[in-house]
A protein has these predicted regions:
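Cys-based phosphatases of the PTP/DUSP/CDC25 superfamily and their flanking regulatory architecture
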Residues: 1-397
Length: 397
């Protein structure tokens, strides 16, 4: 009898122990996986899969007719993209402790993707996942994040790139008066060849971005930890883009760093830009980077707006999507690309209007670049800048 009881209870006890262990550790497994590979989390919402190009126009029309972008944006906001939130606690705490350097304290970088002044691009090339100390954050904190390009599965679904993938962009808030020298030092240390500025100095009487280049020829900018001399080598305007060539010389460095800045003037807050002028900005950005390949000599492109999220995320995702569309004209995954990009900085593509703009941008590109699929024209929100046709910007590179 004893043998029978043991034969029954011992397997039962083992099964119970296994079930308990599975219950205890089931929430930890995704966190461990997230350190190596990251897949978009499953939720109760039914998010759209990658859209076949031949169905894109119909999909866009359906979403527009049903006011679907607002609902889709809310569904995306419910996703727990940052399921390893606990791992970002240090960064968020450190960022709030340096609140005077944040333009918006509700928009701060994550630990895994935070840019630090004092940690140059040469170091990033060797180690994409460093251990960051509190001391380093206290001196080198800046509200800026590395953003990596997404990868794609066999069916066209988006996968977040691992940390070993080099970041192509730095998403940053508009510099404050007190952080201009920090921002310029970051541009030099990261060997950034290009800055995309998506805001004006002021909008509605409110300062949006401290001017970090001289009004005339040369100006010195100083912060608590850094001092930088900036020389404006050239400035020209074409369409809605102002192009500037800046020479930045941090104190103590033997030679200056030259960077090109494109300031896009056709994007008011809480609005979307003219499609033609936005497309032209993407094109001149692509042409410039085609001659300044990222590697030992050049680092990421800096993209900045007021909070480094809404306009900045929209621009970066638009560039990712167009590049993907040119390489693979089978399908496009806008929702997946947005969610994957938010892994590196929260709230990228901040509003439903910006999400809708991305759909319209892809529709525009399908027709403009004679890609496969049919297009449908959707009226965008009215803006005075949209009344004029913007010519292709003829900057030399």
């Amino acid at each position: 009898l004893m043998k029978i009881l043991l034969g029954v209870f011992i397997p039962l006890i083992i099964i119970i122990i296994i079930l308990i262990l599975l219950f205890v550790f089931r929430r930890r497994i995704p966190c461990l996986r997230a350190l190596f590979t990251y897949k978009l989390p499953k939720t109760s919402t039914d998010l759209p899969p990658p859209i076949p190009i031949e169905n894109f126009a119909a999909n866009l029309k359906e979403l527009s007719d049903k006011n679907g972008f607002h609902d889709l944006s809310q569904e995306m906001a419910l996703l727990t993209i940052t399921e390893v939130e606990d791992k970002y606690r240090l960064t968020k705490v450190a960022a709030l402790q340096n609140g005077s350097r944040n333009r918006h304290n509700d928009m701060v970088p994550y630990d895994q993707s935070m840019v630090l002044v004092g940690r140059p691009w040469s170091t990033v090339l060797k180690d994409q996942e460093p251990r960051i100390t509190v001391r380093e954050v206290e001196k080198g904190y800046i509200n800026a994040s590395y953003v990596r390009r997404s990868e794609y599965g066999r069916r066209g679904e988006v996968l977040v790139s691992p940390f070993t993938t080099l970041p192509e962009y730095i998403a940053a808030q508009d510099p404050l008066e007190s952080t201009v020298a920090d921002f310029l030092t970051m541009v030099c240390e990261q060997r950034c060849p290009l800055i995309i500025m998506l805001s004006g100095h002021e909008e509605g009487g409110t300062e949006k971005c401290a001017q970090y280049w001289p009004g005339k020829e040369t100006q010195t900018f100083t912060s608590e930890n850094y001092s930088v001399v900036v020389r404006k080598e050239s400035e020209e305007s074409s369409g809605n883009v102002i192009s500037r060539q800046l020479s930045i010389h941090p104190l103590g460095e033997t030679s200056p760093w030259t960077v090109t800045q494109y300031q896009f003037m056709d994007w008011a807050d809480h609005d979307v830009p003219d499609m033609e002028s936005f497309y032209n900005l993407v094109i001149i950005h692509n042409k410039f980077l085609a001659k300044h390949h990222m590697g030992n000599e050049y680092g990421p492109t800096v993209v900045h707006c007021s909070n480094g999220a809404g306009k900045t995320g929209t621009f970066m995702v638009a560039c990712f999507l167009l590049d993907r569309l040119r390489k693979n004209q089978q399908n496009v995954d806008i929702v997946g690309t947005v969610l994957a990009t938010r892994k590196w900085r929260a709230n990228l593509v901040q509003s439903w209007a910006q999400l809708q703009f991305l759909y319209n941008f892809i529709d525009f590109c399908i027709v403009r670049e004679n890609l496969s699929g049919k297009s449908v024209t959707i009226r965008l929100p009215a803006a005075s800048a949209r009344k004029k046709k913007i010519p292709v910007i003829p900057f030399a590179f």
